[in-house]
Amino acid sequence: MAVLAFSTVDTVLVARHSATDLAALAVGSAAYITVFIGLMGAVMALGPIVGQLFGAGKLAEAGHQVHQAVWLALALALLGGLLLVFPTPFLALSRVDASVEPRIRGYLLGLAVALPAALLFAAYRGFNIAVSRPKAVMVLQLAGLAAKVPLSIALAWGLPALGLPALGVVGCGIATAIAMWVQVFAAAALLRTHSFYTPFGVPMATGTGGLHPPDFKALRAQLRLGIPMGLAILVEVTGFSFMAIFIARLGTTPVAGHQIAANLAALLFMMPLSLSHATSTLVAQRIGARDLSDARRLGWRGLQIALAIALVMGGSVFLARDGVVSLYTNDSLVAAAALPLVAWLLWFHLADAAQIMSAFVLRAHRIATVPLIIYATAIWGVGLGGGYAIAFDVGGFTPAALLGARGFWFASTGGLVLAAVALTLFLLWVLKRERAA
């Protein structure tokens, strides 16, 4: 939740600054999320690998994997930073107004500075969650948020008394970069001072003689799992973020309304995502300890809890959607554009919760290739491809109620439902096969 609060702070502040800045935020966020989440997926392979090693009691080997994840994060940050500094492909897809483009570029420049810190912290987060220390992550993320909020307010709205101009969406990008590096330095200090990390020999821990040199065997193992994981996450995220890029063609008001609905969906997603991380960690640890029966039980229990909570949260937002949207904007046109999209969130969120839990339990078993195929078919094929055809009436058959942004949300919900059903059935097959073995 602390992670998505960064985006929520930006959305609320920018929505009250100008619709043009909100449109820039929607396209810029879509570009950054596409780059960051796709790269972060490769780093996330650290979680199930360390979880199984920790469950087997191989602490030094688990720590060695963290050193390799740092090298991987730095290399990926260089690649991703180039895409953010030179965002022409994203701008070409969005076809935004000329007045919006400079603001997108300025916002992404700040996020390019934030990207190395974000990927390094992803490695820190993956390790801590894998060894059942989520509080260490939560505290630092809340500290980053505490730095982010006042910085965003000052830089986005300005402080005339101090001669600081209102930078709008660009100021939010700068604030994110500062806050992310604060998190990384705080994480390094914690690794250095807390005795828990010493037996692992992780970077910065007491007694560790610096960063281990690249171990290409370990890096290959991480990439073998991380690449399909990263691609699967990239498919899911681009299916959502490219909605914003295509909806931007409709104008600033439709994309501003979409940004509000998208931020709500992302906020709701944080609960099943957190539960999925926790469930995946416990399942991986039980697999490492060779207790497959308990691993199966934990996986199914996690899915049941995620669906129950998703029903309550999604239903609550649906019933209170008018009041929720009013918290984001006082622009009646933007609110009118957002409300029909927010109405889809109940079914969207239920499917999202089911698919992410099933995918994470499969990752605990080090299975990522089949989920990638399912994601590509359901989310790119049905969600994004179908959404484009419906929203822009490619075949001349779209009813008026589904033209524009509503068509994208209709198709994306259908794609998520298909992904959820397919992943859950595949998980059932995997568990039955393990039981038979």
Please name every model-derived segment.
Residues 1-10, 110, 114, 121, ...:
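Transmembrane helical elements of multi-pass membrane transporters/channels
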Residues 4-23, 91-98, 154-167, 230, ...:
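Helix-terminus/linker motif at the lipid-water interface of multi-pass membrane proteins
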Residues 8-12, 89, 123-127, 149-157, ...:
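Alpha-helical transmembrane segments of multipass membrane proteins
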Residues 15, 52-55, 130, 165, ...:
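Membrane-helix boundary and inter-helical linker elements of multi-pass secondary transporters
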Residues 19-30, 104-108, 173, 252-267, ...:
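Small-residue hotspots at the loop-to-helix junctions and early N-terminal turns
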Residues 43, 47, 111-129, 137-145, ...:
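Short runs within selected transmembrane alpha-helices of multi-pass transporters and secretion channels
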Residues 50-116, 150, 154-227, 283-348, ...:
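Short alpha-helical transmembrane segments in multi-pass integral membrane proteins
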